[in-house]
């Protein structure tokens, strides 16, 4: 009996101290990376990079919109669920923080780590004020770390975009993304095992086991099993990234020009017999890789390693209970990040790419070969305006100088061949003789990108209409 009374018990303050140390280490590491990147830019590119986007009405509006949406989600849930959500947010503030972090990730990914810090702190303060929840400094620090991690992912993408070789840029971004996931796994393992071993020594247990004791669920794991689950999750994420990269390589090899970097789809048009190059913007590789990297990294470093420390302060449960609870709900949190963040980024991709292009191209030296995206924006209007003319070499050189990069003679010749191939597909269409062909009034749209705006006059029985067409002329159907 005396043994039980005198047995030392783990103190919550000791665990929270470890959390503050964890925050300080990760914060210093992220700031050190930003400092190293800035020095690298100064040494190689002779310029100081900006870690925040240009302040403007559009960016400020978007940041405010993201903050407002994050706060509104919490308030809407409280209104729909009545007192249940309010009681849940007050009894378990970690649930509220988990919802907040989704929008914090989007803000950091769009605008960088500095804006991510500001958005995270603002979102947490406002949700506590309007929802009447429990304020905990640990949750604020967790949101700040999430915004910084998302912002670092943006900085990595900007850094790899400076490489003039597209394949090298894609591979570098893949390697850095995998490195972030592996680093998050190692940090989580080291931190969780360190705290658990300390608690095991305090309790005097021979084996420290994680126990989840809910009214209808009794579940427990050893530390070894817990570590293996995190390891298998990390391996699965890395394999998914590699498969995504292989699919991207195979797809872009057939759907892009090497030098001009036009992405295209080649298909037989429904209204004529010629094949057209339809220029598209294929950004799905970076978008999906962004979401997977961000979701897995924040899940490991924040939801599993950091937040359970402060869950013990706001609830009556132990640290090992929240470790296991967060692990059990990890698949739901991961899928929720993917489902919510991906479509939002899909809508905001033009804004994100605009920020990337601005950060890459501003004050860039002419000797540095930047992405041909800027050249596309200048050349495409000329192609559309003068489809029947071939771009002259002197004109292309002038456009290249206007977009701040130099071309060798060999690159110039290859680039001209690519532009010629692109414009020839339009030239063939321009030469179609349609003087004796009346417009086709189709009952439905027969092409994803029609050349003409055909008028729909028949809504029923389109099969009979096409089967009984009067004549065919140069690929056109006359009805």
UniProtKB/Swiss-Prot annotation:
Key word Glycosyltransferase present: no
Record flagged with keyword Repressor: no
Subcellular location: Cell membrane
Record keywords, A-Z: Cell membrane, Membrane, Transmembrane, Transmembrane helix
InterPro entries reported for this sequence: Asp/Glu-ADT_sf_sub_c, GatC
A single cellular component GO annotation: plasma membrane
UniProt cross-references to Pfam families, sorted A to Z: GatC (PF02686)
Membrane topology, record value: Multi-pass membrane protein
Transmembrane annotation, as ranges: 25-45, 63-83, 110-130, 133-153, 175-195, 229-249, 287-307, 328-348
GO biological process: glutaminyl-tRNAGln biosynthesis via transamidation; regulation of translational fidelity
PANTHER family, alphabetized: GLUTAMYL-TRNA(GLN) AMIDOTRANSFERASE SUBUNIT C, MITOCHONDRIAL (PTHR15004:SF0)
Family per similarity comment: In the C-terminal section; belongs to the GatC family.
NCBIfam families: gatC (TIGR00135), PRK12821.1 (NF009461)
Descriptive protein name: Uncharacterized protein MG098 homolog
Organism: Mycoplasma pneumoniae (strain ATCC 29342 / M129 / Subtype 1) (Mycoplasmoides pneumoniae)
């Amino acid at each position: 009996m005396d043994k039980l009374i005198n047995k030392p018990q783990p103190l919550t303050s000791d665990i929270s101290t470890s959390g503050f140390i964890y925050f300080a280490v990760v914060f210093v590491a992220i700031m050190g990376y930003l400092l190293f990147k800035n020095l690298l830019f100064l040494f190689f590119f002779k310029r100081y990079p900006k870690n925040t986007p240009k302040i403007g009405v559009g960016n400020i509006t978007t940041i405010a919109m993201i903050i407002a949406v994050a706060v509104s989600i919490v308030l809407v849930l409280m209104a729909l669920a009545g007192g249940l959500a309010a009681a849940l947010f007050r009894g378990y503030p970690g649930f509220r923080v988990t919802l907040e972090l989704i929008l914090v990730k989007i803000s950091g990914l769009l605008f960088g780590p500095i804006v991510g810090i500001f958005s995270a702190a603002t979102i947490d303060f406002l949700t506590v004020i309007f929802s009447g929840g429990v304020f905990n400094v640990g949750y604020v620090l967790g949101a700040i770390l999430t915004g910084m991690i998302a912002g670092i992912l943006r900085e990595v993408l900007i850094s790899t975009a400076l490489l003039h070789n597209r394949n090298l840029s894609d591979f570098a971004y893949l390697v850095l993304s995998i490195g972030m996931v592996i680093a998050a796994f190692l940090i989580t393992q080291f931190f969780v095992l360190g705290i658990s071993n300390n608690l095991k020594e305090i309790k005097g247990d021979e084996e420290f086991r994680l126990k989840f004791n809910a009214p209808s669920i009794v579940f427990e794991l050893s530390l070894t099993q817990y570590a293996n689950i995190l390891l298998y999750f990390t391996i699965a994420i890395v394999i998914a990234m590699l498969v995504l990269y292989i699919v991207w390589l195979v797809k872009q090899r057939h759907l892009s020009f090497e030098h001009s970097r036009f992405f295209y789809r080649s298909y037989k048009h429904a209204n004529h017999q010629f094949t057209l190059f339809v220029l598209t913007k294929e950004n799905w590789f970076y978008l999906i890789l962004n979401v997977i990297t961000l979701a897995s990294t924040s899940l490991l470093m924040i939801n599993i390693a950091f937040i359970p420390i402060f869950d013990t302060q706001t609830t009556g449960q132990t640290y090992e209970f929240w470790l296991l609870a967060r692990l059990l709900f990890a698949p739901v949190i991961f899928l929720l990040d993917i489902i919510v963040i991906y479509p939002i980024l899909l809508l905001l991709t033009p804004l994100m790419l605009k920020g990337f292009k601005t950060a890459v191209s501003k004050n860039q030296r002419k000797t540095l070969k930047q992405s041909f995206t800027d050249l596309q924006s200048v050349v495409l209007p000329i192609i559309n305006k003068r489809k029947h003319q071939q771009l002259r070499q002197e004109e292309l050189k002038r456009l290249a100088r206007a977009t701040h990069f130099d071309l060798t003679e060999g690159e110039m010749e290859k680039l001209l061949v690519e532009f010629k191939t692109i414009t020839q597909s339009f030239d063939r269409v321009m030469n179609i003789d349609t003087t004796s062909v009346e417009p086709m009034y189709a009952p439905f749209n027969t092409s994803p990108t029609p050349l003409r705006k055909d008028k729909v006059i028949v809504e029923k029985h389109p099969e009979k209409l096409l089967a009984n067409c009067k004549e065919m002329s140069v690929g056109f159907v006359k009805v």
